[in-house]
């Protein structure tokens, strides 16, 4: 598959965790995920560099530029304005994570709200079992993305009740 024609997922400030999973997969597919690591360095070339050093330097510089472009292209204008002055993909990624993922207290509140939403779910008369199961699974996966265990048996139990 030609991944150059696949558009990145767009982040508008909502559902950071879902966007981050999709964006990581997108960057992996383009072989750019390593640019998000702390030790990804594009240092200056030494005096009288070898051909191999020049090639490696150019590849790393190009990867960093592509990753930065992907991140810029994957956010709404509102989010872009907040990150446009950041220099590296790592800085952009870390900023988005800190800004939108939320601290532990916020995440625990999100988990509590999702668990409440799960418990309050009832299958509607005109709803198929598949639609209802998909809705429950969606809530469960959001809880899991927030780092909380959620067993499949709990979903099955809810489906059977």
Regions found by a protein language model. Name each.
Residues 1-161:
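N-terminal Lys/Arg-enriched interaction segments
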């Amino acid at each position: 598959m030609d991944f150059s024609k696949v558009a990145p997922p767009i982040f508008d400030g909502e559902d950071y965790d879902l966007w981050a999973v999709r964006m990581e997969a997108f960057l992996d597919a383009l072989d750019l995920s390593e640019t998000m690591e702390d030790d990804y360095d594009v240092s200056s070339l030494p005096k009288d560099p070898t051909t191999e050093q020049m090639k490696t330097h150019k590849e790393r510089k190009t990867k960093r530029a592509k990753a930065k472009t992907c991140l810029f292209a994957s956010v709404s204008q509102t989010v872009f304005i907040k990150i446009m002055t950041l220099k590296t993909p790592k800085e952009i990624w870390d900023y988005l994570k800190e800004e939108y993922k939320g601290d532990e207290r916020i995440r625990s509140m999100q988990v509590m709200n999702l668990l409440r939403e799960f418990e309050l779910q009832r299958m509607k008369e005109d709803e198929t079992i598949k639609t209802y199961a998909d809705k429950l699974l969606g809530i469960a996966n959001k809880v899991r993305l927030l780092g909380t265990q959620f067993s499949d048996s709990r979903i099955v139990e809810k489906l059977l009740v």
